[in-house]
Design a protein with these regions (language model features):
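Mature N-terminal segment immediately following signal peptide/propeptide cleavage
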Residues: 20-62
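Bacterial Sec-dependent N-terminal signal peptides
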Residues: 1-21
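Carbohydrate-binding surfaces of carbohydrate-active enzymes
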Residues: 32-33, 49, 62, 82-112, ...
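Alpha-amylase-like alpha-glycosidases and glucanotransferases acting on alpha-linked glucans and related
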Residues: 153-210, 278-305, 381, 385
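An acidic-aromatic substrate-binding cleft motif
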Residues: 22-38, 197-200, 208-222, 242-246, ...
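Aromatic- and acid-rich polysaccharide-binding/catalytic face
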Residues: 189-218, 339-364
Length: 523
């Protein structure tokens, strides 16, 4: 072999080595995803293709369709959610997603929380109304028993009427009520009569899209959740549309929903005693020991019902139809670890700018304060690690800054915060679908940065997306390795926190996790 041949052979070998070291094609899960707002669902095939091609060119790997309210003046082009036409454009989206290599996910509803036009008042989110009457015994009692709040009267159903005397005696008087009147010969003594009504919150879906307006469903009712999901089955099966890769559920923002129709029966079966026999202690705001124990049992029962009747039923339904679930459990009145772990992909949520004391990082009057506590973010990844889930996702850049004032240099620290919190599958918040012909700046959603082609940061977005993809590729191949573990003292939280319904809200976590966080810091 002469000298020239040897040099050529070495060059070819080196070239082959370099080629072998090229970064492999990343799967869709390793690339960043985005929440894809369909404003009014006013989409069309041409612009769906245009949008997906732009996202794929920049390096996105998934879109999550979330229909919301429409664009002002564009009502004529709105498409009713789950209508035959809506299913047509979803089919087109799925076909184009397959062609461009983008996974197509969708919200199991419009706006948030789950609800809509087919949620009857019977299946709507429920709340308890307690009314107390002080009665002197030793006489025939005729007492009006009715909800005093006139707005609630049409929705309230009497569940129990219980009487308690000073010696702890308890009598069930429910059968003594006829036509809103209690007729009872009260034994001697002072009696406290407590009436319980199963009523309704009357909460409507927030930011609902056309065809998605209506009551929020009762997440604690197995029947209500089943009825809600049946609407999707009818739409997908009648249109012969494939179910999406993933069904998504946003953070739990169901307010005052502290009851469900069969709650007393569920409580007795699970806790071993009847709550109605202890209404005075349950309602005692001074919170002596016995009251704290009863309220803790109440909160555990609420947690069980949400986990079983909503989260697990929703996930089982998705699996039956070939899909998986991605869920934001924060805000739930439940053990967050349990609820996060019950789905395929637990998802947390970031709020505001992560500073990390970076010199020169731009801040101004529109920069949102960071509320992304590390321990709060890690509930999702902790649940994933405990349950052996391969992915933990995040809703990223929520309320970071105003749409067009957000720079990629402000995005990166927030993304890094998610990575150190155990996140390996991030979603932007977010990307509005916008027709190519729409006048700049295109269609917008109020609560977000604007991660789409109309924003000036889109020019450099592919490099940022590539950074995310490389980080997530390694994180998804790795396994969690923690120096120490901390047990979540959920029973202490249920016991110590005031009130009855305890929502584990991110914005209020400073109150319910104070002892947990201080102990963690000491460790």
């Amino acid at each position: 072999m002469n000298k020239k041949q040897l040099i050529l052979l070495c060059m070819l070998a080196a070239g082959g080595s370099i080629q072998a070291q090229q970064w492999p094609d990343a799967p869709a899960e390793a690339r960043p995803g985005t929440r894809w707002w369909w404003l009014g669902s006013a989409v069309d095939e041409k612009n769906l293709t245009y949008n997906l091609e732009e996202y794929a060119r920049a390096g996105m790997g998934a879109v999550e369709i979330t229909p919301i309210y429409g664009v002002q003046g564009n009502d004529a082009n709105d498409i009713q959610f789950l209508s035959p036409r809506w299913m047509e454009v979803l089919k087109h989206t799925q076909a184009e997603g397959k062609r461009t290599g983008i996974e197509i996910d969708m919200n199991t509803g419009t706006g948030w929380p789950f609800g809509g036009p087919e949620v009857s008042i019977e299946d709507a989110a429920s709340k308890a109304i307690f009314q107390t009457y002080d009665i002197e015994g030793g006489q025939e009692i005729v007492q009006d028993i009715n909800v005093t709040d006139k707005k609630q009267q049409p929705y309230s159903v009497l569940s129990r009427v219980m009487a308690y005397d000073e010696n702890g005696r308890c009598i069930n008087l429910t059968s003594h009520v006829r036509k809103d009147k209690l007729e009872w010969k009260a034994p001697a003594g002072k009696w406290k009569v407590i009436a319980l009504y199963n009523s309704k919150t009357r909460q409507k879906v927030k930011r609902a899209a056309p065809g998605g307006e209506g009551y929020v469903m009762n997440h604690l009712s197995k029947t209500a959740v089943k009825n809600y999901l049946s609407r999707f089955d009818r739409a997908f099966k009648s249109s012969k549309t494939s179910y999406p890769h993933t069904f998504f559920n946003d953070s739990y923002e169901v307010y005052q929903a502290d009851w469900t129709e069969d709650f007393l029966d569920q409580f007795a079966r699970r806790r071993g005693y009847k709550l109605e026999e202890h209404f005075p202690e349950f309602l005692d705001e001074s919170r002596p020991e016995v009251s704290r124990r009863i309220v803790s049992d109440y909160r555990e029962t609420i947690s069980d019902l949400l986990l079983e009747n909503f989260t697990r039923q929703w996930t089982d339904w998705a699996h039956k139809n070939g899909s998986i679930t991605r869920n934001q459990a924060h805000g739930s009145p439940a053990n967050l670890i349990d609820v996060y772990a019950a789905v395929d992909i637990p998802e947390c949520e970031g709020f505001g700018l992560s500073q990390f004391h970076i010199k020169g990082l731009r801040q101004d009057s529109l920069t949102k304060k960071n509320d992304s506590d590390l321990s709060m973010l890690k509930y999702a990844s902790s649940a994933a690690h405990i349950a052996g889930k391969p992915y933990t996702s995040t809703e990223t850049f929520t309320w970071l800054t105003e749409h067009f004032r957000t720079s990629l240099s402000q995005c990166k620290p927030d993304m890094d915060l998610m990575f150190v919190s155990g996140i390996n599958h991030m979603f932007f918040h977010g990307t509005p679908y916008s027709p190519k012909e729409a006048e700049w700046p295109g269609w917008l959603f109020y609560a977000s940065i604007n991660m789409n082609p109309t924003n000036s940061i889109w020019h450099d977005a592919p490099s940022f997306f590539d950074y995310i993809t490389r980080c997530q590729s390694f994180l998804q191949m790795g396994k969690p390795d923690n120096d120490f573990l901390i047990y979540l003292p959920v029973y202490d939280m249920w016991d110590e926190q005031p009130g009855r319904l305890l929502l584990f809200l991110c914005a209020q976590s400073v109150h319910w996790r104070v002892k947990f966080s201080s102990n963690k810091s000491e460790i």
